[in-house]
Regions:
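Substrate-binding pocket helix/loop in short-chain dehydrogenase/reductase
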Residues: 108-109, 113-119
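Conserved glycine-rich Rossmann-like NAD(P)H-binding loop of the short-chain dehydrogenase/reductase
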Residues: 45-59
């Protein structure tokens, strides 16, 4: 990997000027969310962090200057919907929400049990939807939502039917929501993150990953596919 988060993000004067000011990062204990939170903080954004691992979350919040933080469970959809109102209260207002939550799952469709399929749909689709649903009423014109889906939406491989279905459901939902919110001046960015080097596939909820090509650099990918679109004007980034 390259240097620290700020170095890889390529922080410039323009970036600092266009970075959202008050940001909720959901999934801040994961690799993508953690990198995004650190880069946004270095650009001067006031960030609130939400994540599954309470201990890691507290550590990351402390390293960013004792930022507001809240642990959540993706299966608690009401709790997911409540993250944005909590962040708005903690930060004073909310300009942007970054959602980087998910879990991988592998195996032919007939080998994936119903419980695993439900888990994949809940964590990869329903939980992010709930977060966004709770955030939309709080965002004013110029507000932005960035949600990580993945390139699997564009080319779902064999052996990942349930995982791909969940991510595709989320991407479809984001596309419609983006059109609905456009008149309000709120952008919804569908982040088609590439496969990254970071061990995500190895932590699958079911099955084992196939042989995968080398992943992209995480810091550079977060900058290109997530942070740059949030500061710019695109609604989908591949």
């Amino acid at each position: 990997m390259s240097g620290g988060p700020g170095e890889a993000a390529g922080v410039s004067g323009r970036d600092a000027e266009t970075a959202p000011a008050h940001v909720l990062v959901v999934g801040a204990t994961g690799m993508i969310g953690g990198l995004a939170a650190r880069a946004l903080h270095r650009r001067g954004a006031s960030v609130a962090l939400a994540g599954r691992n309470a201990e890691r979350l507290a550590d990351r919040a402390r390293l960013l200057g004792d930022r507001p933080h809240r642990a959540f469970d993706a299966y608690d959809l009401d709790g997911c919907a409540g993250l944005a109102p909590w962040a708005a209260r903690s930060l004073g207002r909310l300009d942007c929400v970054v959602v980087a939550v998910g879990v991988a799952g592998f195996g032919r469709a007939e080998l994936v049990g119903d419980a695993a399929a439900e888990h994949l749909m809940t964590v990869n689709a329903l939980a992010p939807m709930a977060v966004v649903r709770g955030a939309l009423p709080l965002l004013e014109a110029g507000g932005t939502v960035g949600v990580v889906t993945g390139v699997i939406v564009d080319a779902p491989p064999r052996g990942m039917a349930d995982y791909a279905a969940a991510k595709t459901a989320l991407a479809t939902w984001l596309g419609v929501v983006g059109r609905e919110q456009r008149a309000r001046g709120v952008r919804v960015v569908d982040v088609r993150m590439p496969h990254l080097d970071g061990g995500f596939a190895a932590r699958a909820v079911t099955g084992g990953p196939p042989t995968l090509p080398p992943g992209a650099d995480p810091e550079a990918s977060v900058e290109r596919h997530l942070l740059a679109p949030l500061a710019g004007g695109t609604e989908r980034n591949r």
